[in-house]
Amino acid sequence: VRLSVVIPAHNEETYLPSTLKALARQTFPPDEVIVVDNASTDRTAQVAEAFGARVVHCGRKGVAFARQAGLLAARGEWVAMTDADSLPTPTWLERLMARREGAVALYGPLRFYGVSPLEAAFSEWGYRAFLHLMALLRRPNLAGANMMFLREAALRVGGFPEVEAREDVLLGYALARLGPVRYVPDALVLTSARRLKRGWVPFLLQQLKNLLGRPEGYFEDGGRGR
């Protein structure tokens, strides 16, 4: 098995079908798709199975635990991760795999969907500028919705740390000590604007807190409120 895709999911029966359909349209099909059912109380597991995904159950509530469970269950040499409310563009995996030579991890940009065209453009270009800056500073900013890494390398550094947020970024920092972590600008993933439910200012303040190491929890409302 060359490539596994892992999706952590807590009560995602509504969003998950669109994510799995987006993966089915990939120009570079993954060898397996794993949905980690993270203490769901809805039909997340049944939805995943209906789409042919392999379901892994993680009873310990928290996205870091779910990602770690997916990493351990994956059979692929490479493991890509996205979120259950995200829509990888059709060439997402193809773009990442094309740039993998010599790298231990790769990541790409995000754009919100479900917002106005202006807000979508703002989210994408603002995030791209941030990623370019971090890449220049050699501070890779892996995002759980758009990342891929060598499974062996991730296991070597212990996988995802047990934190409430930034588990993806912290894994990226650890992987960067082993080898190149590469930014791939054309490997785009669309992600749900439900993260903006409280508005742009609270969202940006939360991201700043996360960046400064004072993360907010993901399960504040019983769901994954990243």
Segments predicted by a language model, with ranges:
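Acidic donor-binding loop at a coil-to-helix junction in glycosyltransferase catalytic cores
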Residues: 165-171
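Conserved donor NDP-sugar-binding/catalytic core segment of glycosyltransferases
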Residues: 91-118
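Glycine-rich, basic loop-to-helix element that forms the pyrophosphate-binding segment
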Residues: 58-74
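Short aromatic/hydrophobic "clamp" motif used to bind/position activated sugar donors
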Residues: 79
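Cell-envelope/extracellular polymer assembly enzymes that use nucleotide-activated donors
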Residues: 2-4, 32, 170
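Short, well-formed alpha-helical segments that are part of the catalytic scaffolds
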Residues: 11-25
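A recurrent flexible, glycine/aromatic-enriched loop bordering the glycosyltransferase active site
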Residues: 112-117, 130-148
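A conserved acidic beta->alpha catalytic loop
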Residues: 22, 29, 37-45, 86
